[in-house]
């Protein structure tokens, strides 16, 4: 089975930063809009799978009103992976835009919010149109759920392949 760009991207991030304890996921969005719920759904799945540092879940979304305050509490030495929904071309719906750099939340709807993350994942949940809010509101929940499962699964797979060797070394005897 061929690995996706999302999987390859996350494997490279996990190889560079294998300690799960040093990773913070900032999952941006709201539970009040189908398309914009991608981030909080991923955050909820990651939290349920045992990730300790997750900002933005369905219970406590990290949306345009709270994102600036939420990221102020992140430790300086943390590796931040920002996750958000976005709109794109009709051909790109269901795909992911990944970057070795920050994400600018709210850009699709004209909001000016600070860039977030050392790495970023944007899920293209619908086609861009003249009314971005409407496009996000009318996004398929089935598509969003599938993309969220794919993202959370790829994250877990990447870090399970790149275990923190220092944690295992305490059980090894010198040769």
Give the location of each predicted region.
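N-terminal catalytic or cofactor-binding beta/alpha core of small enzyme domains
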Residues: 1-80, 85-175
């Amino acid at each position: 089975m061929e690995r996706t760009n999302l999987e390859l991207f996350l494997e490279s991030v996990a190889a560079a930063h294998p300690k799960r304890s040093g990773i913070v996921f900032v999952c941006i969005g709201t539970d009040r809009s189908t398309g914009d719920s991608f981030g909080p759904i991923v955050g909820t799945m990651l939290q349920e799978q045992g990730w300790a540092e997750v900002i933005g879940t369905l219970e406590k979304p990290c949306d345009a009103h709270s994102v600036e305050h939420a990221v102020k509490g992140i430790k300086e030495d943390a590796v931040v992976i920002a996750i958000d929904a976005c709109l794109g071309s009709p051909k790109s719906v269901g795909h992911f835009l990944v970057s070795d750099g920050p994400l600018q939340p709210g850009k699709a709807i004209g909001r000016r919010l600070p860039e977030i993350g050392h790495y970023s994942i944007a899920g293209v949940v619908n086609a861009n149109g003249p009314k971005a809010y409407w496009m996000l509101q009318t996004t398929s929940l089935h598509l969003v759920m599938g993309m969220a499962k794919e993202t959370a699964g790829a994250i877990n797979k990447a870090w399970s392949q790149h275990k923190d060797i220092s944690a295992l070394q305490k059980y090894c005897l010198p040769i």
